[in-house]
């Protein structure tokens, strides 16, 4: 969205059909527009911060992170969601559900933003269990375990919404269904 104007929306069904994370698709498409308009593309972190309306806090964590997928994909998480290894999520033993973290791989300085939706890990000394997609963004999928530093993020603006406000132009009159709307 630009102001109150909807530029595009990604249906959850489309991202599933493409086998791609909806956040990454939204960022790629937004960056295609930005490049066409001779504007710097956004990094993954910049896009996620804008998409979720987040800002950094002073609370930091560090430790060892692993990732989980395969066997758990499609199973129930501790907060009642169905686990999707392609989402930007993380398990933590005590952080409140829906807490956002900016996690940085200390070996290569790559970062990703994840949302707490599960409990774990339960193997010492690990303190985070990342989704497969989050691990890929940190280049930790093959190593399996990585030292990290994380910053707790807090909301500073409205999050993306599943139902956009009613269209104000005739060309949007046929917009239907549940949409994933990006506002960055």
List PLM regions with ranges.
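Exported/periplasmic cell-wall-interacting domains
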Residues: 76-184
């Amino acid at each position: 969205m630009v102001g109150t104007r909807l530029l595009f929306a990604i249906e959850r069904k489309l991202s599933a059909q493409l086998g791609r994370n909806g956040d990454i698709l939204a960022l790629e498409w937004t960056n295609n527009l930005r490049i066409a308009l001779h504007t710097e593309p956004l990094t993954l972190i910049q896009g996620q911060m804008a998409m979720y309306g987040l800002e950094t806090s002073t609370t930091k964590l560090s430790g060892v992170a692993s990732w989980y997928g395969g066997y758990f994909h499609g199973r129930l998480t501790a907060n009642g969601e169905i686990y999707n290894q392609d989402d930007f999520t993380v398990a933590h033993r005590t952080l409140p559900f829906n807490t956002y973290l900016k996690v940085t791989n200390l070996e290569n300085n790559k970062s990703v933003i994840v949302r707490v939706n599960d409990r774990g890990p339960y193997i010492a000394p690990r303190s985070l269990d990342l989704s497969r997609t989050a691990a890929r963004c940190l280049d930790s999928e093959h190593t399996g375990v990585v030292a990290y530093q994380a910053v707790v993020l807090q909301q500073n603006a409205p999050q993306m919404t599943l139902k956009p406000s009613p269209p104000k132009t005739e060309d949007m009159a046929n917009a239907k269904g549940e949409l994933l709307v990006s506002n960055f």
